[in-house]
Amino acid sequence: MAKKSGSGLQSSAGLMRYYEADKNAIHIQPKTVLIAGALVGIAVIFLSAVNGFWP
């Protein structure tokens, strides 16, 4: 069998770059997304009812 060369540093270097970029990203909690979606849904239903588009 062929012997693998290298110690896998390239794959771990890619992971380190990913985690460094992830620290700089904007983080939003899942609860915040659900609440925002519910509020938008309620607003759409309310505005549809007010403007006479309710079925």
From Swiss-Prot:
Belongs to the SEC61-beta family. Keywords: Cell membrane, Membrane, Protein transport, Translocation, Transmembrane, Transmembrane helix, Transport. Residues 50-55 are extracellular. This is Preprotein translocase subunit SecG. It comes from Methanosarcina mazei (strain ATCC BAA-159 / DSM 3647 / Goe1 / Go1 / JCM 11833 / OCM 88). InterPro entries: Preprot_translocase_SecG, SecG/Sec61-beta/Sbh. HAMAP family: SecG. Its main location: membrane. Residues 1-29 are cytoplasmic. It is found in: Cell membrane. Involved in protein export. The function of the beta subunit is unknown, but it may be involved in stabilization of the trimeric complex.
